Amino acid sequence: YTVCGYVTDEVTGETLIGAGVTVSELAEVTGVTVASTGSATEEIHSVTAKTGTSTNNFGFYSLTLPEGEVELTYSYIGCASKTKRISMKKDLTLNVALAPSAEIRSARITARKDAGIRSTYMGAIEVPNELIANTPVVLGEKDVLKTLQMMPGVQGGNEGFSGIYVRGGGADENLMLLDGTSLYNVSHLFGLLSVFTPEAVKKVTVYKGSFPARYGGRVSSVVDVRTNDGNSKKISGSVTAGFLAEKFHLEGPLKNENTTFSLSARGMHTFLFDRVIKWAGSPLNYAFYDVNAKVSHKFSDRSRGWIGFYSGRDYFRYEDKSKSSKRFYGSDYEPYTMITGNENNLNLSWGNNVLSARWTYIFNNKLFADFTAYGNLYRMGIHSVTENLEKSELGETSFRSVSDYSSGILDAGLKADFDYTPSTNHLIKFGGEYVRHGYRPEITKSRIKDVNDSRVFADTTYSDAASRQVNGNEMSLYVEDDITGERQ
């Protein structure tokens, strides 16, 4: 028979990813104890054999057990364990909520030296949000990728920047996923921060090697970021002002506990930097923002749905103006004044916009399904203006040049993932994905104007192919078979 269900946080109602479910099969053994009075009493002792599993990315677990009495122990980091004793006489659905525990007790940690190499995911590291929140970083801004830099096999490159280099690979050779959707150029402030807002993150898993087949493979690593579903018990939130940015987070139930929302926003404040920039006379200006929004709904014990949105963008501006005047003498030795003005403006921006819809369904106690539709638009653009002016009593000469550069990637995809658990030590994952890629590699337009004769030269630089979108189709199927043998 099979027992399945969800493991959640008792306070917030959030599903817990990677929660442990340990099974103790009870076998009754009769023994005889001789009391100090000399009389013999019969006692029943329980001899247990432990096995177990853990919850998936949606907090779901499934265990197939033989008929009889069993004890299920549910545990999660930072939560008090809970034990349920059940009788396996039919298939059961058992949802459990764990309460956070602030009590610190003495503990003995025992581990096997070969535990890592015996795992099918020996290159995987799970990073909970609590670790991200407690990691000291430069300028006080908590960051997901800077926390990963402290993990074995991961390096950070330049000190203080958020790029990760896994086992000798490059910073651009990592697959970055936000709730299953690929992101591009995941950096703010030219690499000082990542686009992942810590308040919106539930859990991060990084695969440094032996990538699971469902990700399709990458050169260096896979970073899978999962966001919060929202507090189903009450409205809660926070407002934070840091050295670089302000952050806002709000979550709670919309109508009842079955529908929740989570909203996080982060933006770089410029009031401090504007004063420093103006005081230093610098022509630079910079800003960025992130917005994460998610609505979750529980249709039934077997069916749940999510709609998620992310938008993040960086803006860089350079503006330089200069003006000078000089006195000259003409051929007739008459003096005249030449006024020269120069203006240079440069605007650079880039960012991702993601929209996704997800539905999960439990077909039976052994088969869990996840269906996702998503789209991501990444855009990068440069707008520059150069203007020169020369004016005197002899006449006026003006030159103006405007240049626009843009490129982008549009991904639209459908994905289906299934988890099938035929037995406690056997998990089969299978599914497929279709992605439609739209590439705009490079479009450059230039306009040059000479004021003297009012001529305008329009130049669409590069070939005609640059103005067209190049499309590509990607389809994949995968099967993962994870079997854990009994340790002798």
PLM feature segments, named:
Residues 3-9, 59, 96, 107:
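A short, amphipathic beta-strand motif
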Residues 28, 70-84, 114:
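A short, solvent-exposed loop/turn motif at the edges and junctions
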Residues 27-60:
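Short, acidic Ser/Thr/Gly-rich low-complexity loop/linker segments typical of extracellular
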Residues 232-233, 255-350, 380, 384:
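Periplasmic-side early beta-strands and strand-to-turn transitions of outer-membrane beta-barrels
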Residues 56-58, 78-80, 92, 110-211, ...:
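Periplasmic N-terminal accessory/gating domains of Gram-negative outer-membrane beta-barrel systems
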Residues 296-314, 346-488:
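Face-selective signature of the C-terminal outer-membrane beta-barrel domain
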Residues 94-96, 150-151, 195-238, 247-251, ...:
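A beta-strand signature from Gram-negative outer-membrane beta-barrel systems
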Residues 227, 243-245, 254-256, 267-271, ...:
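Transmembrane beta-strands of outer-membrane beta-barrel pores
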